[in-house]
Amino acid sequence: MNKRVKDVVDAIVAAVQRVLDQKEVTEAEYRTAVHYLMQVAEQRETALLCDVFFNSTVAATKARISEGSTPAIEGPYYRDDAPLVDDRLKTYDTDDHKPLLIQGTVKAVDGSVVEDVTIDVWHSTPDGKYSGFHDDIPTDFYRGKLRVGTDGSFRVRTTMPVPYQIPDQGPTGALLETMGGHSWRPAHVHFKVKAPGYETLTTQYYFEGGDWITDDCCNGVQSSLITPDIVEEGVRLMNINFVIEPARAQAGANP
């Protein structure tokens, strides 16, 4: 028996049972919910539904016990096969969005330089889509892997991402609408920072003053993840100093 699985599932079941009782959910409402979950599965939106309502809580829990930079939701558009890049992500020739320079450092909790660090960077196209997932956009556009310098520094040029709507034509979008919500995410850039012997940091950073920054449909925005509105010579700057922590044992790793 996996005690960790039992403890978590028992707690989830107890919480749902408590809400069913407190809200006096009827048999008809219960059956509607069961049918809804079947629709979610049939339309392959299980991951989307869970990400919208629960992923930010998992990220916030990790942030609470972490000594490193603030983690955030990964989202569904990460690809491990992104190409290595030197100083620029590949973008459309027709992309006339404001240039963006992402730069900063990666350090350990004690401030020391970490060896052999790579950073995955990915963000939306100017029309709110992701390479390798939408419209046959080549997988090497708007994403790449950076090798961090021996001094812990990195920099890469790209263009500004845009706010976009998560898929909202299926049951997840219908539920958000029924609840009076919406399906918009603020513009952001994703990062995954990896180094041998260290916890992988998965996070995303946002832009001060951006649309939907205070009303993200996925509740993913934390104040520590919002970068200030700094523009130099027509280039928006995103300055980030990542802090990563030593790897630790994972709860429930052994059955």
From Swiss-Prot:
Its EC number is 1.13.11.-. Pathway: Aromatic compound metabolism; 3-chlorocatechol degradation. The keyword Disulfide bond does not apply. Keywords: Aromatic hydrocarbons catabolism, Dioxygenase, Iron, Metal-binding, Oxidoreductase, Plasmid. Its cofactor is Fe(3+). It catalyses: 3,5-dichlorocatechol + O2 = (2E,4E)-2,4-dichloromuconate + 2 H(+). It comes from the Bacteria. One of its GO terms (molecular function) is ferric iron binding. Signal peptide: none annotated. It is an enzyme of class 1 (oxidoreductase). Binds 1 Fe(3+) ion per subunit. PROSITE patterns: INTRADIOL_DIOXYGENAS. GO terms for biological process: catabolic process; catechol-containing compound metabolic process. The keyword Glycoprotein does not apply. Pfam families: Dioxygenase_C, Dioxygenase_N. Fe cation binds at residues 130, 164, 188, 190. Preferentially converts 3,5-dichlorocatechol as opposed to other chlorinated catechols. Retains diminished activity toward non-chlorinated substrates. PANTHER family: DIOXYGENASE, PUTATIVE (AFU_ORTHOLOGUE AFUA_2G02910)-RELATED, INTRADIOL RING-CLEAVAGE DIOXYGENASES DOMAIN-CONTAINING PROTEIN-RELATED. Belongs to the intradiol ring-cleavage dioxygenase family. This is Chlorocatechol 1,2-dioxygenase. It comes from Cupriavidus pinatubonensis (strain JMP 134 / LMG 1197).
